[in-house]
């Protein structure tokens, strides 16, 4: 993608284009290379993508790339130990993708109201509804505006329950100088077309407990250790029911250059946000969402 004539918002006379997926010209070279190797499924390019993401956003902690952000959330819920009939607290304002994996499991979703100033989970309502029945809290950082993680983590610690962040819209975000993906038990990211970077479609799961890494990899691919299989080990010890949730090398090739160009991508989005805030704030009929001072 190129930003035509350095215009921040391209005027289409009738409509302003909502977004363009960021796909670097350099990605085509990586894609061509993958096609020439004929390694188009999950392979070394996915490993390279995960390593670069970990280095840039997760303080070098291990993570797993998935076929979608929804896949990443489903794995997070499973790794958090959520089972059928478990109560999970979720913000009422979110994409259906946050909740659908909970329905796969058969969990009981209990909605928490949102703070109208941020569109994020309302901590006061969370305090009213959390109980000994609660298994986990899911929070969504709407529009890159970080939730009040200090309070949410404090509540979760009191009840000894897990916190799962849906950070589909918050790549590169920080809370009290901590990067999103390093704060809670689990954090799910999305690389769908409209996100900060795209892999065509894809996602990624980060987790605090690094001992879950091997299990997460198995759950991502039929409950099998895929690396051992690739090395020619024909005995497959299937330890649990797994899924087919892996990212492909083709998707990773598209997204890898986006990781390298992330600073430029984020800067461009911030400029667009500033234009909207500056102009829409003048309209008394429109309420604009602003970042909290402690959040970035």
Question: Which residues make up each language-model segment?
Answer:
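A generic structural signal for well-ordered alpha-helical segments
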Residues: 102, 156, 280-281
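N-terminal "arm"/small-domain region of PLP-dependent enzymes with the aminotransferase-like
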Residues: 1-40, 237-239
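Structural detector of well-ordered beta-strand residues that form the stable sheet scaffold
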Residues: 64, 89, 110, 162-164, ...
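Active-site phosphate-binding strand-loop segment of PLP-dependent enzymes
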Residues: 117-199, 204-212
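Phosphate-binding glycine-rich loop
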Residues: 39-87, 101-105, 111-113, 178
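Conserved coil-to-alpha-helix start sites within the AMP-binding
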Residues: 93-99
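PLP-dependent aminotransferase class I/II
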Residues: 6, 15, 21, 46-51, ...
């Amino acid at each position: 993608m190129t930003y035509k004539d350095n215009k921040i918002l391209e005027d289409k006379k009738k409509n302003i284009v909502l977004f363009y997926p960021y796909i670097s010209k350099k990605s085509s070279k990586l894609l061509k290379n993958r096609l020439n190797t004929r390694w188009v499924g999950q392979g070394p390019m996915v490993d390279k993508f995960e390593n670069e993401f970990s280095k840039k956003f997760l303080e070098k902690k291990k993570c797993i790339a998935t076929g979608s952000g929804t896949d990443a959330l489903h794995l997070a819920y499973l790794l958090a130990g959520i089972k059928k009939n478990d109560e999970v607290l979720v913000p009422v304002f979110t994409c259906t993708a946050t909740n659908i994996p909970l329905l796969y499991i058969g969990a009981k979703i209990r909605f928490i109201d949102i703070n109208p100033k941020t569109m994020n989970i309302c901590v006061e309502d969370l305090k009213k509804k959390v109980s000994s029945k609660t298994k986990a809290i899911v929070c969504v950082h709407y529009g890159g505006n970080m939730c009040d993680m200090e309070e949410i983590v404090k509540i979760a610690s009191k009840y000894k329950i897990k916190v799962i962040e849906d950070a589909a819209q918050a790549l590169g975000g920080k809370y009290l100088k901590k990067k999103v993906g390093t704060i809670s038990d689990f954090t799910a990211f999305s690389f769908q077309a409209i996100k900060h970077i795209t892999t065509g479609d894809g996602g990624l799961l980060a987790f605090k407990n690094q001992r879950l890494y091997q299990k997460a990899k198995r759950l991502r691919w039929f409950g099998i250790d895929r690396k051992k299989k690739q090395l020619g080990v024909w005995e497959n010890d299937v330890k649990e029911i797994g899924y087919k949730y892996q990212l492909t090398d083709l998707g990773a090739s598209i997204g890898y250059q986006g990781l390298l160009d992330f600073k430029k991508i984020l800067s461009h989005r911030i400029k667009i946000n500033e234009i909207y805030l500056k102009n829409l704030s003048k309209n008394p009929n429109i309420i604009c969402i602003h970042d909290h001072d402690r959040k970035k």
